[in-house]
Amino acid sequence: MKIYEGKLTAEGLKVGIIVSRFNEFITSKLLAGSIDCLKRHGAKEDNIEVCWVPGAFEIPVIAKKMASKGKYDAVICLGAVIRGATPHFDYVSSEVSKGVAHVSLDKEVPVIFGVLTTDTIEQAIERAGTKAGNKGYDAAMSAIEMSNLMKVLD
């Protein structure tokens, strides 16, 4: 039996990161977590490129653009969608997750879903670097592992 796994080294990896400007007080912490993870695992700062978009809904189209270029080993998508009093949360959360998954499958590039979908601001803050860890860091770990696994399987 053969078992395949991706290494947890970012040396030589080129990573694109897309960050939603909406809820920037949260997303900037997710971005910092992603960059910290990539650098701790050997990525060079010159191999990390960041695109800011207005909101989470705009993430998939830029993910598609970045994944289509063929220069990124992975694309990390970061955002924070927080439930409000209207159904807007449900529409945005659903479409962003579908869009990100579609791009990854279509382009065969790891496109990592690091978009927080929380009921409260407090939950988002917890997931952006306090008691629930930093989901931006976690998304970068997934990007590293998946990028290396894709290389093993090529």
Curated annotation (Swiss-Prot):
SUPFAM superfamilies: Lumazine synthase. GO terms for molecular function: 6,7-dimethyl-8-ribityllumazine synthase activity. 5-amino-6-(D-ribitylamino)uracil binds at F22, A56, F57, E58, A80, V81, I82, F113. Pfam families: DMRL_synthase. Pathway: Cofactor biosynthesis; riboflavin biosynthesis; riboflavin from 2-hydroxy-3-oxobutyl phosphate and 5-amino-6-(D-ribitylamino)uracil: step 1/2. It catalyses: (2S)-2-hydroxy-3-oxobutyl phosphate + 5-amino-6-(D-ribitylamino)uracil = 6,7-dimethyl-8-(1-D-ribityl)lumazine + phosphate + 2 H2O + H(+). (2S)-2-hydroxy-3-oxobutyl phosphate binds at A85, T86, R127. Its EC number is 2.5.1.78. GO terms for biological process: riboflavin biosynthetic process. Belongs to the DMRL synthase family. PANTHER family: 6,7-DIMETHYL-8-RIBITYLLUMAZINE SYNTHASE, 6,7-DIMETHYL-8-RIBITYLLUMAZINE SYNTHASE DMRL SYNTHASE LUMAZINE SYNTHASE. This is 6,7-dimethyl-8-ribityllumazine synthase. It comes from Clostridium botulinum (strain Okra / Type B1).
